[in-house]
Amino acid sequence: MALLRKINQVLLFLLIVTLCGILYKKVHKGTMLRNEADDDSETPEEMEDEIPVVICAAAGRMGAAMAAINSIYSNTDANILFYVVGLRNTLSRIRKWIEHSKLREINFKIVEFNPVVLKGKIRPDSSRPELLQPLNFVRFYLPLLIHQHEKVIYLDDDVIVQGDIQELYDTTLALGHAAAFSDDCDLPSSQDIHRLVGLQNTYMGYLDYRKKTIKDLGISPSTCSFNPGVIVANMTEWKHQRITKQLEKWMQKNVEENLYSSSLGGGVATSPMLIVFHGKYSTINPLWHIRHLGWNPDTRYSEHFLQEAKLLHWNGRHKPWDFPSVHNDLWESWFVPDPAGIFKLHHPNS
């Protein structure tokens, strides 16, 4: 009898330890991405009517996110819910900027991203160190940000929206596709820009085809690439296909084998997405992602073409709040001054 009692005590102890381990794991995972407004309750009808837009607000370029938000909000009558993502030390500044500016009327939630989720998954060698910043990888973790919504828009912070965001949200995703992107070969005018500044628009520019792991993928190096700075995503498919886990796997492989090409600095976050989504994504209307405005300060699009564009993206080194840059007047018209006076434009006439 005493032996049986002792066995029961041991089993009870093991059960308690197991439950504590499970509880710790859940709590720890929940702190990687924390939503300040998780206590907000919304009816199913309200959630159906909302268009969730995820955008990151990094400390050194927070004015970019605010300009993007301003352009989206000002060009639509749709019910937008902005998920503004930042690191812990920037959250209060994000809130102050929104609540003490013309953006105070927007519907928003502030979300904390904890970089611990990226530990051991990023190689420190990049020609553009700014692309190694933690927030550059937020797009990999969308399901941990969005819990109630079936469909979500992700935008890089260096964009301006000139059209009604409802049109982008209405992008049709084919059955079995977790996301839609804009191909790098989809616009004649984009092709002209590619030639002028010597840009790559194929997988060759992002993956190192000298490596066996890349060759074994069976993807032609001449396959047209896409830019993940604008994403329309289906959260159900994303979770079903375990997209986040797949992306993390290819991040880890790159740490171990250095699989990404050094010819393009943007390959840090783009390359794993090109692998995971190869042949399995829908396409966005090309006018909803006019890009490469930040690649060369001497290369410009025509004014007529820019007026037709629904979304402008200054991907590249030359940002519209800095000098030199091109078409910065289009960006500056949406700039929201920093109430704290920290973020300033670096233009000769500013």
Curated annotation (Swiss-Prot):
<feature type="topological domain" description="Cytoplasmic">
    <location>
        <begin position="1"/>
        <end position="6"/>
    </location>
</feature>
<dbReference type="Pfam" id="PF01501">
    <property type="entry name" value="Glyco_transf_8"/>
</dbReference>
<keyword id="KW-0808">Transferase</keyword>
<keyword id="KW-0735">Signal-anchor</keyword>
<dbReference type="GO" id="GO:0016020">
    <property type="term" value="C:membrane"/>
</dbReference>
<comment type="similarity">
    <text>Belongs to the glycosyltransferase 8 family.</text>
</comment>
<keyword id="KW-0325">Glycoprotein</keyword>
<protein>
    <recommendedName>
        <fullName>Glycosyltransferase 8 domain-containing protein 2</fullName>
        <ecNumber>2.4.1.-</ecNumber>
    </recommendedName>
</protein>
<dbReference type="InterPro" id="IPR029044">
    <property type="entry name" value="Nucleotide-diphossugar_trans"/>
</dbReference>
<dbReference type="GO" id="GO:0005794">
    <property type="term" value="C:Golgi apparatus"/>
</dbReference>
<keyword id="KW-1133">Transmembrane helix</keyword>
<feature type="glycosylation site" description="N-linked (GlcNAc...) asparagine">
    <location>
        <position position="234"/>
    </location>
</feature>
<dbReference type="InterPro" id="IPR050748">
    <property type="entry name" value="Glycosyltrans_8_dom-fam"/>
</dbReference>
<keyword id="KW-0472">Membrane</keyword>
<feature type="topological domain" description="Lumenal">
    <location>
        <begin position="25"/>
        <end position="349"/>
    </location>
</feature>
<keyword id="KW-0328">Glycosyltransferase</keyword>
<feature type="transmembrane region" description="Helical; Signal-anchor for type II membrane protein">
    <location>
        <begin position="7"/>
        <end position="24"/>
    </location>
</feature>
<dbReference type="InterPro" id="IPR002495">
    <property type="entry name" value="Glyco_trans_8"/>
</dbReference>
<dbReference type="GO" id="GO:0008194">
    <property type="term" value="F:UDP-glycosyltransferase activity"/>
</dbReference>
<keyword id="KW-0812">Transmembrane</keyword>
